[in-house]
């Protein structure tokens, strides 16, 4: 029988008394630190006509961070886990347990940029173009955090040598066996069903690849809005592709037995991204 790797990470970095520090939360801290450094670098060497001082960048990042956390959590509750609030009223605040929605976080960031651009009398797209190149690194680190937590695993596969066994997928495995009882032999042998490590797929595509493309594209002067449009377009496409390998949420499943909620939420990103890029180049 083929060997499949079983990730077995402790989600807690260290524990001091009754306080625990989690890898998932650390990914947000690292993302914030990188964004702070990278955007100051962009102001100094690439774009220097938007902010009068680095303190303005810091203020914007604080707003964005709040937008990501609040919007991401609200989005996750509304889109994926509304029922959890009825079981645990404080669950909304347990961010260390995971459970963030990119699309909700995106809405939160958009609102924070709108507020900042209004207060500073700056163009919304000009500011978003400045910020966007720093976003993919945060996305990649977030997916790494998902992998360490053993969540958001992929669909069952027996055809690839890098398939993995996720212990936290036990309930999903048992439900899958009801549909595919012929896989019970593999479940009994491995103790789990081998799955795509879709968190790592997302880390590579939405983190590394997207960062490289957006960074190279943003190093030259571009029409206002084109960088933001390219980000929306590429992220939407990458997410739609990866969703075919990612296990749909257990309580939602496939919509019309074909499409996932993540794909439904990503299609508008592709459309709006294309429109923004088209308009930005047509009227530059």
Swiss-Prot record:
Its EC number is 2.5.1.145. A 1,2-diacyl-sn-glycero-3-phospho-(1'-sn-glycerol) binds at residue 143. GO terms for cellular component: plasma membrane. It is found in: Cell inner membrane. It is an enzyme of class 2 (transferase). It is a multi-pass membrane protein. InterPro entries: Lgt. One of its GO terms (molecular function) is phosphatidylglycerol-prolipoprotein diacylglyceryl transferase activity. The chain crosses the membrane at residues 19-39, 60-80, 98-118, 130-150, 199-219, 225-245, 258-278. It comes from the Bacteria. GO terms for biological process: lipoprotein biosynthetic process. Keywords: Cell inner membrane, Cell membrane, Membrane, Transferase, Transmembrane, Transmembrane helix. Pfam families: LGT. Pathway: Protein modification; lipoprotein biosynthesis (diacylglyceryl transfer). HAMAP family: Lgt (MF_01147). Catalyzes the transfer of the diacylglyceryl group from phosphatidylglycerol to the sulfhydryl group of the N-terminal cysteine of a prolipoprotein, the first step in the formation of mature lipoproteins. Belongs to the Lgt family. PANTHER family: PHOSPHATIDYLGLYCEROL--PROLIPOPROTEIN DIACYLGLYCERYL TRANSFERASE, PROLIPOPROTEIN DIACYLGLYCERYL TRANSFERASE. This is Phosphatidylglycerol--prolipoprotein diacylglyceryl transferase.
